[in-house]
Amino acid sequence: MIMKRLTIIDFVEKYTHEYSELTFLREKVDGVWTETSFRATREEAHKIGAGLVALGLKKGEKVSLLSQGRNLWITSELGILYAGGVNVPLSIKLTESTDLLFRIQHSESRYVIVSEQQLSKIRSIIKDCPLVEKIIVLDPINDYQDNEIAISDIIAMGEEYLKEHAAEFQTLYESIGPDDYANISYTSGTTADPKGILLTHRNYTANVEQGASVIHCDKGDVMLIILPLDHCFAHVAGFYTMMSYGGSIATVPIGKTAIATLKNIPIAIKEVKPMLMLSVPALARNFRKSIETSIKAKGKVVERLYEFALNNAIKYNKEYWNRGGWQAWRYPLVKLFDKIIFKAVREGFGGRMKFFVGGGALLDIE
């Protein structure tokens, strides 16, 4: 039997029905962690998608998305895809106006969705983006310009559109095929102009299916995403994989500055107590450095015991899929040191950690 080649839309429809009332999105709002169900996530994505259609977005047209990680980032991307559009996720780390300008122009984006924090970057270049018809702002602001509209207005437009055109909207999103483009992911452009990588719906869903064979989690498990959502790694190993398991994802609360957001990471870890996290090598090295600094502060004996325990665990686990084997004799030591050393390390990550998934670049075995 040949499996159906799923689109992201197929994927979302399947799992939001299967896990309808389970929590999918977690976000801290005014100091309180809020929960959004699979059903509510789909409903908001439908409204945003229908609102974009009402605004004028046509199938295959591009929408740039520039925002910190948050629930509205995810539902905005899903809304773009439901409307038949192509998301162009932009990194908030892009500070040079020319970097943003190139990507928006090169992708031929017709709309830009942006957070209040990033809005000034778009306003500074919008005069040079003649193809952009509207800027959609994710946060309430006091000074909307003529070409700007609130996401709440898009959602309201979507609600009205669906009252009269629900069947047409369904026909639209059901017409999307696995080989239709879902995303244009730009390279960093450090040595030349950035390259726009065209990714199809099936690129994503196939990767999720492959990733699910490696990342094993349970329904209801929680992942804290500390990586930028514009990165493909965060898409695949992050919210689409967790969606397939009936798990939920939490995003780090947005600070007033990038540094403030970074400081929110350890707070979020303690509050969310995630079972899974994603990391790139540079971030993993920072976590390890922080752990080993704490170990060294406890004295030479503890430091040497930690080093012995770590080396023993590395030799036993190897690449994990081939753990044990002729190193199986190390297993009792692995269990012993897990109780007296590594349990404390896990407690620092909330106490429920199952997987710390590395990717995005070459990851050392250590």
Task: Describe the function of each predicted region.
Residues 82-158:
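Structural core segment of the AMP-binding/adenylate-forming
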Residues 24-70, 78, 95-101, 150-158, ...:
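Conserved AMP-binding/adenylate-forming core of the ANL superfamily
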